[in-house]
């Protein structure tokens, strides 16, 4: 309940009343089509149709609403009336994303983390995405580089190149991803989705493989742009000048005429124009060119190795002693060779013509594919991947727990293992990570350390055994009979991130229970976690609490939904004297209860902040328009008071959000 209230209040603070009405309707109603939204909100005194569309666009732009588009079923008459080339009639279903609205509380944490880990350029890029929600790559880099240029007064090309590198790193580290682009889906496609995923479509040759690769790339939200980037970063050293112009035009939004010299050197233009682009080669064209090139190379080798002397056939008779016959034979041989050479030249010219025709068509096809890919990449919108930030905060909490429980070396060892299997960790998943080998862990641990702080195999094996023996285990060693473990001398390990997060959540719950019910309440809670089901007398004896005080404490905790009561009757009439009353703890329910309490506290704190600032709203607006010399003493006191209250309440909200991260997002 309060989760929805907090999300609606955050949207209202950021986007105003009209957008909030649409978002609140989707939160309360759930998935709804545009027709239903329009009928519900466009009544008397409501929103206009145009305004509803604008509000939906704003919510989609800032990742607060997602949509699915479905093709409408048509009759035979309607199908016959369709105009070829026009899109099929469809309807969209919209759904609010409450979690993304809650994530807006954490934007200061996101910026602070990315600034310390990736640098100022990454922070500028993240701020632009926070302000605009979704942006194309060229516009994003252009706006972020302009901010950097104002601050440093550096050359624009150097700044743009640096931002391109940073943008690539953010994609590869999955902090930025492609915004989803849902396509219209029919009911038949929806029903056959599972069967289509199970089948692997080969595509019937090179064209099918190429199309399948592009479809896989489009479905991957972390795929790098195909033009202008490689897997290792921006393509800054490409020989083809046309590729340079196209890639720079995509990355910076500038025209290609600003980078290519107007008068290139002789031979350069000819060479670059004749060279096909390596970034977008069609497999089919390559195969056909390969076959032509093979037939040509046979004759090319003959031509290169052909001497200036005459080539004599084997069936020609040569008489060395008879000079006249030799001259006669040589004349005959010359005529024969001339005829063969003419046929050879004719075949070669025909092959050259066919090869040049194939090469020209393949170049045109490649140029068309490149141009289409440039257009497609320029339309791709990039947005923030909230899940990756939650994963980073989650791993930081695990590192702090391991360091606190063991020592600094165990924490560094945990970080080394996490770096090797980071891609298998999810923000809301408690399964084990992928396997990592002991040798790789040792290499990763010793990579950035001094020689005096490095570990050997015996030390790292000792630390891993300690982490495995802890309860619950932080790492799990694979069985020696498994293939992964037998291939490594130190064995293969998995990181138990789920176990560590479970203990962190339990510690958080225990701290809240101690604040609410004191040491006795905490002792009862931990006792029930260990023993599962206990009677009141057993709880009083084991927790060393007087029976009357223990009974009052139990009923107080049961009233707050901390513990629960289970009745086990010995007779069908459920008589009290013949019934066992056992208390137990349901930890997931307690976590859900405390999460709702935290949302309630955040909502009340935000309302308190509004009520504190409301009386001074007009005065604060006037203060922003005045100079420092014109501010009176009373106005300065009001400003200091409101600033102190604002900072205090915002700090409270951030601290509450830290607890919310552990209980709700992890």
Curated annotation (Swiss-Prot):
Residue segments, region Disordered: 179-228, 250-307, 320-371
Gene3D superfamilies: Winged helix-like DNA-binding domain superfamily/Winged helix DNA-binding domain (1.10.10.10)
GO cellular component, one term: RNA polymerase III complex
Main location: nucleus
Feature: compositional bias, Polar residues: 253-262, 321-330
Top-rank lineage group of the source organism: Eukaryota
Localization of this protein: Nucleus
Key word Zinc present: no
Keyword annotations of the record: DNA-directed RNA polymerase, Nucleus, Transcription
Alphabetized Pfam families for the sequence: HTH_9 (PF08221), POLR3C_WHD (PF22536)
Subunit structure: Component of the RNA polymerase III (Pol III) complex consisting of 17 subunits.
Family affiliation: Belongs to the eukaryotic RPC3/POLR3C RNA polymerase subunit family.
Function: DNA-dependent RNA polymerase catalyzes the transcription of DNA into RNA using the four ribonucleoside triphosphates as substrates. Specific core component of RNA polymerase III which synthesizes small RNAs, such as 5S rRNA and tRNAs.
Name listed for the protein in its UniProt record: DNA-directed RNA polymerase III subunit rpc3
Organism: Dictyostelium discoideum
